[in-house]
Amino acid sequence: MNAEFALKGQETKASLVNVMSDVARPNWLLKLLPSSKGQEQAPVEKLYYDVLEASRQPVFYLEYEVADTFDGRFDMLCLMMSLMMARLKKADSENKEFAQDLFDAMFRDVDLTLREMGAGDLGVGKRVKKMSEAFLGRLTAYDKGLVEGNASILAAAIARNVYRREEEADIDLRLAEQCLRLFARLEDVADADLYAGAPIFSQLVRTA
């Protein structure tokens, strides 16, 4: 996958702060995303929030031992976003503009999250740029394993980018195999449902 995405200077309501700012709280796994009832959201925002919720599922932090930290949660968001981006690439219409909009939604949220967490205006832009570059690197690293259905390739990328180490371990392969199962189920989701922002992905993770 060519990482042909660029940041845009737009603003939107943040919800990532609710994922990232409570990492020290003992009940973070039980905390739900804020309700958006009564607020009209664009389909791409709905899809982003669904990917975000998928990345928060307890199974990743308990069974797969992803670090319960800001970095760990961001790494899982990058992994789940990579699955969604790879799925969108396979859509019949291959709506590249929609994929760009999804990327924008993610990093508008990252920007506002960092501000909510107290980062100064001067530092936010640099951190957002660094995080967007990190995501694009992961997007490329994960794509080969996802597209080829190769758990070993995907596991090597997960070891480096989720567990932050060069040596591989059994848990890398377990998480890679889980991601491939999720990706296979995503392929069965209708393109129209994805473009409508249907909350399907997080449900797939919960029932996997």
Residue ranges and their predicted role:
Residues 2-79, 83-208:
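Surface/interface-facing alpha-helical segments and adjacent flexible terminal/loop regions used
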